[in-house]
Amino acid sequence: MNWINKDTEIYCSFAKNAGNTGCQMMNTAFYYYGLNKVYKSFSINDIGKAVDSVKTLNIKGFAITMPYKIDVLNYVDEVSNSVQDIGAANTVINNNGYLIPHNTDYLAAKQFLIDYVGDELYILGNGGYSKAVQSAAKSLNIDYQVITRDGWGSIQNIRHSTSYNCTPVENIKVSDTNKFIDCLVKTKTGKRLATMQASH
């Protein structure tokens, strides 16, 4: 059994409303591989102060979720071209006080979308996660349209296409003729995406 001690490395996630999925997945992996690491999720209201705490406490890395995936880029030390092109990050590595963001949402979305090439793609939402999906679609030459909340009523009129929910909205109704990808981790596709994202 692993015991937390003075040498335990800390990893975490920051969200408006923290969940347990990351804690369960990451701590299970740490335990399985006998790693002296622990993962904890935090609900926060100020991403800037949260990032400051990472440096103060020497937290080794952190995940970011809604609604901070875009804003976090204002508080890191370096932004790669790929992250800059996406305009959002979901993972930050602390390299001795130097914070470098990454976007594993993009990698998972690209891996997932390969199975859906050929369909017209509708991306629901335009936040940080949506930006990763948009970049993944572009990289695969998939034509897509973004539907924001103002156009929400049009979702039920979409036929013979793929809809990709990038919002926290649950139970979205789509036509039976559509494929539906939901990023919410409590859904079947959301669990697959979370596993793919964590593997990167």
Positions of the model-derived regions?
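Short glycine-/small-residue-rich Rossmann-like dinucleotide-binding loops
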Residues: P67, Y164-N171, L184-V185
